[in-house]
Amino acid sequence: MVKLRLKRCGRKQRAVYRIVAIDVRSRREGRDLRKVGFYDPIKNQSCLNVPAILYFLEKGAQPTGTVRDILKKAEVFK
């Protein structure tokens, strides 16, 4: 099963997260299937590849709670 979840990047005390499609059995920092966006919680900024996100959601991918909140804020779910 595939999930849309956050992958931590950046440096200490300055985290930036990539939103990735990844196998549910993989570690947080494991190999992802595809990068579909990023989220910066400090600047409260996000950039999303909406067609790729919709593709994975149509194929049955489940977003985690935090990713679901980011997608709702960006109005991906209409």
Swiss-Prot record:
Broad class of the protein's primary localization: plastid
Matching Gene3D superfamilies: 3.30.1320.10
Superkingdom, natural source: Eukaryota
Entry GO CC: chloroplast; mitochondrion; small ribosomal subunit
GO BP annotation list: mitochondrial translation
Subcellular location: Plastid, Chloroplast
Any Pfam family hit: Ribosomal_S16
Molecular function in Gene Ontology: structural constituent of ribosome
Magnesium among keywords: no
SUPFAM superfamilies: Ribosomal protein S16
Entry keywords, A to Z: Chloroplast, Plastid, Ribonucleoprotein, Ribosomal protein
Family, as annotated: Belongs to the bacterial ribosomal protein bS16 family.
NCBIfam families, A to Z: S16
Protein name stated in the entry: Small ribosomal subunit protein bS16c
Gene that this sequence comes from: rps16
